[in-house]
Amino acid sequence: GTLLPSGAECCEALAREVSGSEEAFVALMNQKAAELEMQNTHFCNPTGLTELEHYSTAADLAKLLQAALQNPTFRTIFTTETYTSSATAQHPEGLLLVSTLLSRLDGTEFSDGAILGGKTGYTKAAGLCLASLAVVRGKEYILVTLGAPGSHATVQTNIQDAIQVYRRLQKKK
């Protein structure tokens, strides 16, 4: 639920499970940001939802994504289009979780590569955001875009922008 599709309540539960409290988890987040030299980032919550002193940049988030992709479990989740959970009493067939990025793509966005995974985001303050991973002409690229116009109910300009950037990389010799 934290990445597929996206759930603030899942982030909060994960934070409490890992660290005992959201505050302790946020301290770990800021410690990791310092280790990764994310100099323009300060976390206030585990969800990414708007708070006055909660901020980052596309460059810093790209550093974080690059580090996270080194973890095989994270990479698998980040690049998964759908996942069905184990059966429970409430969901005897399991619960279907769907990538908010990959579910919007059909694999024909560009000819010599593919968008492998990503995480969309939106708040009124931040606009449409996207952190994505693609392979273009055999090379992997990370792209983070922030502040695209629109909302969940509009055209996903953040995804359109990423496709255009990856297409330009494909044309580059």
Each language-model region and where it sits:
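Penicillin-recognizing serine hydrolase domain
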Residues: 20-173
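Substrate-binding clefts and substrate-entry loops adjacent to catalytic sites
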Residues: 4-16, 44
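Signal peptide-directed extracytoplasmic domains
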Residues: 1-4, 27
